[in-house]
Each structure stands twice: as structure tokens, then as C-alpha cells.
């Protein structure tokens, strides 16, 4: 409840990734996290490159990323309700540079899937038009 209050979360959710960035920095006593917007859908090559760079750079330094996603029918992580668009946040806390996949911790646990791998391409397609904290 205290974290939700700090985030300004209501029954309608948490409005903007910037709220996550602010609370992460306050709770960790750091200025590490920045809000990265991804307004273009599909994302530009530069936005995709920055996202991959942020994943590798941050995770290698023990800073997971938080992504604000929009998951419409046909482009959803495992277990998501198939007939609806889900607006959600999850954490990116690992990656595989060879396979270009990312490890997700998902607090919703749709279908019992709390930890799972996504392709980088799918992650990059889920974030627009929102953003992420890195």
C-alpha cells in the first residue's frame, strides 16, 4: 500500500513510467534510473538500439529495467488473456545476447507465468507508445 501511494497508483493503474522512475530512484537512493519514451509504433531503429543497449548496460550493473507495456490480442506474453488489450508493467532482469531474448519478472502471473523469456523483438513491440525506466 505504501508503494502504491508513492507511485500515485489508483484503481485505474499507474499513469506514466515516470512515476516508476521517480520512486525507484527515491527508494534506492540513486539517480540511476531515467525515463525512456518509446512513442513510435513500431519503434525506430534508434529506439530499438537504445533499448537493447539499456538492457545490457543496466543488467550488467545489477539494475533491472521496468517496462510499461501495451499487449494487444495477437501480441501478448505467455498466459495473458487472449481477447483483450492489457496495459501493464513488468521487470526485465536478464538477457541472452546470443538468442536476443530477455528474462521477465511479471507480477501479474497471468496463467501462472511469473518468470519467462521473451524475444527482444517482442519486447520492443510491446513498449510503444509507452516507455521504460532504465
Residue ranges: model-predicted function:
Residues 2-134:
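Conserved active-site-adjacent core of cysteine acyl-enzyme catalytic domains
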Amino acid at each position: 500500500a505504501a508503494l502504491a501511494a508513492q507511485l500515485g497508483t489508483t484503481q485505474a493503474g499507474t499513469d506514466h513510467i515516470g512515476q516508476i522512475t521517480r520512486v525507484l530512484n527515491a527508494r534506492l537512493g540513486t539517480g540511476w534510473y531515467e525515463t525512456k519514451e518509446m512513442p513510435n509504433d513500431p519503434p525506430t531503429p534508434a529506439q530499438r538500439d537504445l533499448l537493447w543497449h539499456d538492457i545490457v548496460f543496466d543488467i550488467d550493473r545489477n539494475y533491472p529495467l521496468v517496462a510499461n507495456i501495451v499487449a494487444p490480442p495477437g501480441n501478448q506474453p505467455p498466459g495473458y488473456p487472449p481477447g483483450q488489450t492489457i496495459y501493464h508493467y513488468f521487470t526485465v532482469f536478464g538477457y541472452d545476447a546470443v538468442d536476443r531474448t530477455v528474462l521477465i519478472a511479471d507480477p501479474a502471473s497471468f496463467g501462472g507465468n511469473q518468470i519467462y523469456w521473451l524475444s527482444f523483438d517482442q519486447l520492443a513491440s510491446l513498449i510503444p507508445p509507452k516507455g521504460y525506466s532504465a
